[in-house]
């Protein structure tokens, strides 16, 4: 859902120079396609904010035409990120900056040019193959621990001994493993 908010009261403020870029806050002086990697990263993880019209040092520069810039940002996101991320755009009228707030998405991974991104402190980087697989599972609402284990010939002698010592469970069976979410009848043992 995309929302334009023309904000006449809320202002980023003159003290923005005290603010620094973080894992969830990015400054962009102008609108270039590089912000799309950050939109992917924010959608894939914890969300975040990109403020356009502010340089890397936190100095407000403003944008020449904030309304047109807002439309440009929306079009770039809609044309370049798949699936469609959840975001809002706010024009800060008193300093001609634009605040893009990106929510963490549910349909992960969010891709820009067929690649998924994440934030590493203040940098945006491409995820590796393992992390990409984890994002796919998360997008399907599946955790690694819920996947069937490739090796179904497992023994739980140490677990049995510890359960016996700590909480006096003497009867160790598949029902015990089901209770611990380590086994189900359909898929057998899981990760």
Where are the regions a protein language model picked out?
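Polybasic/polar functional segments that serve as interface/processing modules
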Residues: 1-50, 54-116, 150, 173, ...
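Active-site helix-to-loop segments that bind/position phosphate- or nucleotide-bearing substrates
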Residues: 121-191
